[in-house]
Structure formats: structure tokens, C-alpha cells
Amino acid sequence: MNRVKSREYLLQLAYQMEITSETALETFNSFMENEDISKDDLDLAYIKSGLLGIEENKEKLDSLIESQLVKWKLNRISKVNLSILRISTYEILFAEDVPGKVSINEAIELCKKYSDNKSVSFINGVLDKVYKNMQ
């Protein structure tokens, strides 16, 4: 199974949840019904648990993210960057099989691919603070 590819799909689905207001289960089931996407290499359990975990802990994740922002409000962060922050913060807090530093590095890679270069240092800074506060 390819965790990097699975994390990319998790980002896309977390973003979809954010813009459509679908539940995690609706979003995941819609993804599973899409026959155009090969799921052979994906860690579907990781994707599903990530979506459900983000939905279940959204207030806690957002509160933790917002507490690390300097001169920013959560509603100013792009939906893509917010989705990246939520995924990584969720992993730092709850995913025992993903070391925090690995999650931060993967978030930076997602940011480079799906956002802009200016956001990389922002994402890195916020997640580094989240990680250090969890130690």
C-alpha cells in the first residue's frame, strides 16, 4: 500500500468535505463508488479513519491550529491549507503509527504539490508549534 498516495486522496477528500459539507462517511462512500479511481495501491483504512477522525475531532483540531496562529484567523487560511493542517494535526494527536515529524514532512510535501510556495513555511511553522506543544 502506498501511504503517500493515500494521504493525497485523504487531502482531496478532506477538502471535498470542507467545501460540500458532506459527512466523512458520505465523502468516503462517494470516493469508493467512483470507478475511475484505482484503489489497488491505496490504504483505504487509513483514508477512512483519517476522514472520520478529522470529522469527529474537528473542533479540537481547529482550536489547536488556531492557538498556534500569529496574526491570523482560521477563516483566512485557504481550504487546501486548512485541510493539510487538519490532517497533520490529527496524525500528530491520534495516529500512533505516524511519527509527528513524518506527518509534518508529508504535510509540507502536500503543500508544495497542492498549494503555493509561500504556504510551505506557514504550514511548517504552525505544525512545528503543534508538535512541540504535544511533547
Swiss-Prot record:
GO terms for cellular component: cytosol. One of its GO terms (biological process) is transcription antitermination. InterPro entries: NusB-like_sf, NusB_fam, NusB_RsmB_TIM44. Transmembrane segments: none annotated. The keyword Transmembrane does not apply. Keywords: RNA-binding, Transcription, Transcription antitermination, Transcription regulation. The keyword Transcription applies. Pfam families: NusB. One of its GO terms (molecular function) is RNA binding. Involved in transcription antitermination. Required for transcription of ribosomal RNA (rRNA) genes. Binds specifically to the boxA antiterminator sequence of the ribosomal RNA (rrn) operons. Belongs to the NusB family. HAMAP family: NusB (MF_00073). This is Transcription antitermination protein NusB. It comes from Clostridium perfringens (strain 13 / Type A). The gene is nusB.
